[in-house]
From Swiss-Prot:
GO terms for biological process: glycolipid biosynthetic process; phosphatidylinositol metabolic process; phospholipid biosynthetic process. It is found in: Cell membrane. Catalyzes the alpha-1,2 addition of a mannose residue from polyprenol-phosphate-mannose (PPM) to a monoacyl phosphatidylinositol tetramannoside (AcPIM4) to generate a monoacyl phosphatidylinositol pentamannoside (AcPIM5). This is Polyprenol-phosphate-mannose-dependent alpha-(1-2)-phosphatidylinositol pentamannoside mannosyltransferase. The gene is pimE. It is an enzyme of class 2 (transferase). It holds the Pfam family GT87. One of its GO terms (molecular function) is GDP-Man:Man3GlcNAc2-PP-Dol alpha-1,2-mannosyltransferase activity. It comes from Mycobacterium tuberculosis (strain ATCC 25618 / H37Rv).
Length: 431
């Protein structure tokens, strides 16, 4: 009897311990999620290594594999701080005779990049590519975490996505030019992922100080009521302006009073590489549309569509809501070069592997974007334009240049409509 009295509680305790056993040979995460076999994981590692190696081989062995023109502008433009008053007079024309590239970034970017001019450029270029690839993998991993993944799972898919994404057009041009947009995307994703308001604000504010386009992320912070983070991002951005005024006062004032908003200085508005509303409508009209009635109407219509898409998404879908904001920002900006469209990587992940993947049309959109970007339609269209400066072109080329714009509208429209489908369909089934 005594044994029975003891055995009962003991057995009950053992049963409970087994339920919460963390030393089991099968971790809880593994029991919840089926991990890929070791062979598949090794294959993903091999594919990633081959992809990285092929990209580096292309850079250094192929004719015109990469010219790093934007990285030259970052580094050499920042070096002009040694000669006061020359920052926004600097141009890089060694490999761009058709368009000598000026330093077009906020003055804080020059402060950030200034130390790099002390390092041999060849070493900077190599490290820049490696850091960009690491940032791409980091962006994929954070995208997975925003969709509910854990630190222990998702590495297999992340390696596959990174290996493939290296070769889509936004990333190809990023590597070719030595662009910074992947790092800025990583900062924005991290700002959304972290619960620390001050870190979110710091990341968005600093990123906006280096390049203005990440400022659109503050709209997301306001939309999800992270008001402290949004306000702090403004404070940090203003602090970057203050630092710029202290270091290069006259140049900073010149940028924010004269150069800010001068899209023509950034580059040719109507080249096929500019996949914004302003670029698309300018190609159709045959002249720079500016922010005229047609462009403003297109932006306003897109804003309405983006709001509908935002409202259709579940509150917990942080990545989906962020993507709605970033896609709207790409169409809003006067210039959205193809290397600005690195946001298509988390978009494809969200469509193919995310919470909406089972909805009709999700994977069609995801794979459709992948085909568009692997082919690189704007890049192909660039061969049909006589020069990057010529705005007028045959009507069929002008309309073909809407490719990213139309695909974005289709994506936003699908997000808004698919939620309606989910809400209505169960009622129809019940009838």
């Amino acid at each position: 009897m005594c044994r029975t009295l003891i055995d009962g509680p003991v057995r009950s305790a053992i049963a409970k311990v087994r339920q919460i056993d963390t030393t089991s040979s099968t971790p809880a995460a593994a029991r919840r999620v089926t991990s890929p076999p070791a062979r598949e994981t090794r294959a993903a590692v091999l594919l990633l290594v081959l992809s990285v190696g092929a990209r580096l081989a292309w850079t250094y062995l192929a004719p015109n594999g990469a010219n790093f023109v934007d990285l030259h502008v970052y580094v050499s433009g920042a070096a002009s701080l040694d000669h006061p008053g020359t920052l926004y007079g600097y141009v890089y024309a060694d490999q761009t005779p058709d368009f000598p590239l000026p330093f077009t970034y906020p003055p804080f970017a020059a402060v950030v990049f200034y130390p790099l001019h002390l390092v041999p450029f060849g070493l900077i270029a190599l490290l820049w590519q490696v850091v960009t690839m690491a940032a791409l993998y980091g962006a994929v991993r954070i995208s997975q975490r925003l969709m509910g993944g854990t630190a222990e799972t998702g590495h297999f898919a992340a390696m596959l996505w990174t290996a493939i994404a290296i070769w889509i057009e936004p990333l190809r041009s990023t590597f070719d030019y030595g662009q910074i947009n992947v790092l800025l995307m990583l900062a924005a994703l991290w700002a959304v992922y972290t619960p620390r308001w001050w870190l979110s604000g710091l990341l968005v504010g600093v990123a906006s100080g280096v390049k203005l386009t990440p400022a659109i992320t503050a709209v997301y912070l306001v939309g999800v009521r992270r008001l402290h983070a949004a306000a702090f991002s403004v404070v940090v951005f203003l602090a970057t302006v203050g630092v710029s005024l202290l270091v290069v006062g006259d140049e900073a004032r010149y940028y924010f009073t004269d150069l800010l908003g001068d899209a023509g200085r950034v580059g040719p508005i109507a080249t096929s590489f500019n996949q914004s509303w302003r670029g698309a409508i300018s190609r159709i009209l045959g002249h720079d549309a500016g922010f005229g009635p047609l462009v403003l109407a297109a932006i306003a219509s897109t804003a309405v569509l983006a709001i509908l898409a935002w409202r259709a998404l579940d509150r917990s879908d942080r990545l989906g809501k962020l993507l709605v904001v970033e896609l709207f920002g790409l169409l809003l900006s006067p210039i959205s070069w193809t290397h600005h469209w690195v946001w298509l990587v988390p978009l494809m992940i969200w469509l193919i592997d995310g919470p909406a993947r089972e909805r009709p049309g999700a994977r069609i959109l995801g794979w459709g974007w992948l085909v568009l970007t692997i082919v690189g339609v704007p890049w192909l269209l660039s061969f049909a334009q006589p020069s990057i400066w010529q705005i007028g072109r045959p009507w069929y080329l002008a309309w073909a240049g809407l490719v990213y714009v139309v695909a974005t509208l289709a994506t936003l429209g699908w997000i808004a409509a698919s939620e309606r489908y989910v809400r209505i369909r169960p009622r129809r089934m019940a009838n």
